[in-house]
C-alpha cells in the first residue's frame, strides 16, 4: 500500500494534533482490527474515517481518500475516550 500526503499538512499535523505524524497514522490503515466508515460530510471526493492502532501503540482516527492507486492521508489525531471504547470493544 502506497501512502501520499500534502507535505505542509504533514508538517502541521503533529503541531495541531498531539504529536500525531502521518507516518504513525499510516500504520492505522494497516491495522487488521481497524474500523472504517465513509465520511458523509464531504461531497467533492470520497473520504473515509478509520479508527485503529497507530505506529506508537495509541489509538488514532485517520481521515483519508484514494487517489490513483495511493492512499492520501488528510488528517489524523488521537482517538477520544468514546472512540477508544469502540475500538477496544472488539477484543
Residue ranges and their predicted role:
Residues 1-91:
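Ribonuclease/tRNase effector modules and their secretory precursors
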Amino acid at each position: 500500500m502506497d501512502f501520499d500526503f500534502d507535505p505542509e499538512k504533514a508538517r502541521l499535523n503533529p503541531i495541531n494534533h498531539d504529536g500525531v505524524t502521518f507516518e504513525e497514522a499510516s500504520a492505522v490503515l494497516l491495522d487488521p482490527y481497524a474500523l472504517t466508515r465513509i465520511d458523509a460530510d464531504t461531497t467533492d471526493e470520497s473520504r473515509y474515517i478509520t479508527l485503529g492502532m497507530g505506529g506508537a501503540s495509541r489509538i488514532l482516527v485517520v481521515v483519508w481518500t484514494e487517489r490513483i492507486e495511493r492512499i492520501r492521508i488528510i488528517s489524523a489525531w488521537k482517538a477520544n475516550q468514546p472512540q477508544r471504547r469502540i475500538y477496544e470493544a472488539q477484543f
